[in-house]
Amino acid sequence: MKVLKDKIWQYEKHGIDGEVELFGVNIFDYKWEDTKEIAKECDFPIYKVVIDGKEHEFATGEVSNNVWCFYLPKE
């Protein structure tokens, strides 16, 4: 996987598997597409998801059993 250096990734939230709201929806209800890139700040894989026709990016990793940490690109 390549490390993405162009964007700065910022901590957004953490939560239990199946119960995290990102972009106004439960992110676990959507299919995540692995971009094969890594966010430098957190060393997590970057994913893309399409919600209501709009593509969003986030980085995430499971930091404990069923506990996920999410980062978003800083605007």
Give the label of every model feature segment.
Residues 1-2, 73-75:
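Short intrinsically disordered terminal tails
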Residues 12-74:
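Acidic, low-complexity, intrinsically disordered interaction modules
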